């Protein structure tokens, strides 16, 4: 699914210990978040009812100054079993490409730091 962000914001370890990426879309939103110490990543699309907690090891991601790509790893039996056992909505969260206005180098570095925190928790800090 390709999405185009009108606006995006991010936070790294705010006062509540939350790191998050928020993408405002033309007709909705997409957000990824993780609390410090939490094992799972929360993904939410357009409605809190669509939110799901997912092990970040289920994903591979890539980002550059104009897009963020998120894919569920589908060639790993352990991941596939986890997705099935936890009733993960792979239709909604299986493959997402978010396009956004080009970022400056400092913005990209800040976005990269938040993304590392989301997917690796405290491992890299």
Where are these regions (language model features)?
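C-terminal partner/receptor-binding element of secreted or periplasmic proteins
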Residues: 110-123
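Amphipathic protein-protein interaction modules
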Residues: 49-109, 113
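Charge-rich, low-complexity N-terminal segments
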Residues: 1-31
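A generic structural signal for beta-strand entry/edge sites
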Residues: 16-20, 29, 38, 58, ...
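Short, well-structured hydrophobic secondary-structure segments
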Residues: 24-54
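Generic detection of short hydrophobic beta-strand segments and adjacent strand-loop junctions
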Residues: 3, 10-14, 43, 52, ...
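Generic "edge-of-domain/loop-turn" microfeature
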Residues: 28-30, 37-39, 77, 105, ...
